[in-house]
UniProtKB/Swiss-Prot annotation:
Keyword set includes Transcription regulation: yes
Disulfide bonds: none
Organism: Human herpesvirus 6A (strain Uganda-1102)
Induction record: Detected as early as 18 hpi.
UniProt keyword annotations, A-Z: Activator, Host-virus interaction, Oncogene, Transcription, Transcription regulation
Family indicated by similarity: Belongs to the herpesviridae US22 family.
Function: Involved in transactivation. Displays transforming activity.
Transcription in keyword set: yes
The name this protein goes by in its record: Transactivator protein DR7
Domain of life of the native organism: Viruses
C-alpha cells in the first residue's frame, strides 16, 4: 500500500482515509484494494493488541506499550557532531522485564540520519532523517511511523556471536553510509562513544563524530574515576580487541537485611523502597565475551560468553559474575587477558581477595 497517499501516517488515520475513499468511490478497481487494506489494518490492530498484552506490567501498558523498534535502554542519549552535543532525553524501557532483550546500538549516518541496530534480531532500523528530527520526535513514536528495516545480509545463524555484531555494523556502515560506534572517551557530560567512519575495509576506522552516553546526575561524580578504571582494564591494544559500552544493567544489590516495603516508616522516616541498586555497564568485545563493569567500584568481570547466555540469564547474570576469572581469583600463570595487568606472585595463590564485596 506504499502507493497510497496516506502511507506512513498513524494507523487510525490510514483507516479513516481508506474508509473515506471506499465510501466516495464507485469504481471497483479502486474499492477492492482499499477494502483489502482496511482488513489488513484490522489484523495489524489485533497483532499489536496481543503484543501489548504480552508485555503488560500495568493497565496503562495497553495504551503506552513501546514499539518493538524503540531504543530501550537505561541511558541518557545525546547526539551531535563535535563538541556541540544535542540532548535527546532519558530513554528507558517501561514495559519490559529485562533490558537485555531490547539492547540497541545507536548509529548516526554521514548525512545526519539516526539509525538503531537491534542486537538480538540483527536488524538495522532508520529512526529519523536528522538528529534535529530525532530530538524533536524522540523515541515515543508509533510503530507505523518508523521507516522499514534496512536490508542487511541475513547472518543470524551466528547472531549470538559478538564478532557477528561488529561484522553487521561494519557492513551496515559500508552499505548505508553510517558512522559506527568505537571506543570510549571522557567529556564534560559524561562518557562518550567515538563514532568511527569506515573507509573501504570494514576494519579500517577513522574518527568522524561523537555520541555521548550519560547516566542520572547522582552518578556524575563517578565518571572520571570510572573512565580511568575502565581504561586501566581495557587498555589500547588489549587482546580482547575493540569494545563498546552497549547498555546498563541495574538490579537491587544483595544486602544482609532486606529492604523495607515501599511506603513504610522506619524510625519515623518514610522509605521510598529499595535503596541500594547495583549498576553495571555491559561492555561488548570483539573477541566474544561480554564484560560487566561496575562504575562505582571499578570492578570488571566476564558477564557472559555470548548474547544468548545473557538473554537467558537477564540481570540475574550479575549474581554469578565471580564464578568467572577475576583479579585475585585466578590461578597463577592462568591470567585471563582481561587481568594481564594484575601480576600475582608465582607459586602461591593470592591471599588478597581483591575486587570482592
Amino acid at each position: 500500500m506504499r502507493h497510497l497517499p496516506f502511507h506512513g501516517m498513524p494507523l487510525r488515520v490510514q483507516m479513516f482515509c481508506a474508509f473515506f475513499i471506499r465510501s466516495e468511490t464507485t469504481d471497483k478497481n479502486k474499492a477492492t484494494p482499499t477494502i483489502t487494506f482496511m482488513v489488513s489494518c484490522c489484523f495489524v490492530w489485533v497483532k499489536r493488541l496481543f503484543y501489548r498484552v504480552g508485555r503488560i506490567h500495568h493497565v496503562q501498558s495497553l495504551t503506552y506499550a513501546r514499539p518493538i523498534t524503540a531504543l530501550d535502554s537505561c541511558l541518557y542519549v545525546c547526539c551531535g557532531y563535535g563538541e556541540k552535543l544535542q540532548p535527546v532525553g532519558f530513554v528507558k524501557s517501561y514495559v519490559t522485564n529485562s533490558q537485555l532483550d531490547t539492547l540497541r546500538v545507536l548509529l548516526v549516518g554521514k548525512d545526519g540520519a539516526v539509525y538503531v541496530h537491534h542486537m538480538r534480531a540483527a536488524r538495522l532500523c532508520r529512526l529519523a532523517s536528522s538528529t534535529t528530527e530525532f530530538t524533536r520526535r524522540g523515541l515515543q513514536r508509533d510503530a507505523v511511523t518508523y521507516e522499514e528495516d534496512l536490508e542487511l545480509p541475513d547472518q543470524r545463524m551466528c547472531g549470538t556471536n559478538a564478532r557477528h555484531l561488529f561484522d553487521v555494523i561494519a557492513a551496515a556502515a559500508d552499505e548505508h553510509n553510517l558512522l559506527t560506534v568505537g571506543g570510549l572517551c571522557q567529556t564534560h557530560a559524561g562518557v562518550s562513544c567515538n563514532l568511527l567512519e569506515t573507509v573501504g575495509d570494514p576494519w579500517t576506522a577513522v574518527p568522524a563524530a561523537r555520541m555521548t552516553l550519560t547516566v542520572p546526575q547522582v552518578q556524575y561524580r563517578l565518571w572520571p574515576e570510572a573512565r580511568r578504571d575502565l581504561r586501566r582494564h581495557l587498555y589500547a591494544g588489549h587482546p580482547l580487541g575493540p569494545w563498546l559500552v552497549c547498555g546498563v544493567l541495574s538490579r537491587e544489590r544483595e544486602t544482609q537485611k532486606p529492604s523495607p516495603p515501599i511506603r513504610t516508616t522506619v524510625g519515623n522516616v518514610p522509605t521510598p523502597g529499595p535503596r541500594e541498586v547495583e549498576i553495571a555497564w555491559v561492555v561488548l568485545t570483539l573477541a566474544g565475551p561480554l564484560l560487566a563493569f561496575w562504575p562505582d567500584t571499578g570492578k570488571i568481570c566476564r558477564l557472559a560468553n555470548s548474547f544468548s547466555t545473557l538473554w537467558k540469564m537477564g540481570p540475574r547474570a550479575m549474581r554469578g559474575h565471580w564464578t568467572y576469572s577475576a583479579p585475585g581469583r585466578h590461578l597463577p600463570g592462568d591470567a585471563w587477558p582481561l587481568c594481564e595487568h594484575v601480576r600475582p606472585q608465582v607459586g602461591k595463590l593470592p591471599r588478597k581477595r581483591a575486587y570482592l564485596d
